């Protein structure tokens, strides 16, 4: 199954895209420049985690950065997440610019392995490895050089994307070996 996800932001304001994905609502009707998590998420908000909890799911969020960023800790709670794992929950992680996508996916697998038997699990993992900007000083193991490009930022972006693709393959291969039906939505 595949489709398109149209987002209302570009280049900043990740939390607004998260809000739209988790609630099914648009930020179009909020004031221009709003940060929904910081300005409007004060009470319980109808969202996918709250709905899934009513169906018996345990709902967890992972973001390997500070929970204070964009007021995620409070916002995730208002959406119904049972637990929110932040940078503090990663012990000696691998870094690729930031905490690597593979480390974040290892945390997803850890949560799956440790879940209560028979209880369905929803994990929302907001990775951070490829967060902008695209400085050009990373020492890549296998750099990707765009043919004909003289922009070092392109090499940085594409090299980071390749490492992310490899990490995503690691996650998919793990769940392909599990008997329990699993949906990975990227």
Model regions and ranges:
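Solvent-exposed soluble domains appended to multi-pass membrane proteins
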Residues: 1-186
């Amino acid at each position: 199954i595949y489709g398109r996800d149209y987002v209302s932001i570009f280049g900043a304001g990740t939390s607004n895209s998260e809000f739209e994905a988790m609630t099914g609502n648009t930020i179009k009707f909020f004031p221009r420049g709003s940060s929904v998590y910081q300005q409007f998420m004060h009470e319980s908000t109808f969202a996918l985690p709250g709905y899934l909890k009513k169906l018996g799911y345990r709902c967890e969020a992972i973001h390997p950065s500070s929970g204070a960023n964009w007021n995620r800790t409070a916002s995730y709670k208002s959406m119904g997440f049972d637990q929110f794992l932040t940078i503090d929950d990663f012990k000696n992680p691998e870094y690729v610019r930031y905490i690597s996508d593979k480390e974040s996916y290892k945390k997803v697998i850890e949560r799956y392995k440790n879940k209560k038997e028979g209880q369905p699990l929803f994990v929302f993992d907001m990775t951070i490895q490829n967060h902008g900007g695209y400085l050009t000083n990373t020492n890549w193991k296998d750099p990707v050089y765009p043919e004909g490009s003289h922009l070092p930022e392109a090499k940085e972006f594409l090299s980071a994307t390749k490492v992310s693709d490899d990490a995503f393959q690691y996650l998919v291969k793990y769940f392909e070996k599990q008997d329990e039906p699993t949906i990975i939505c990227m």
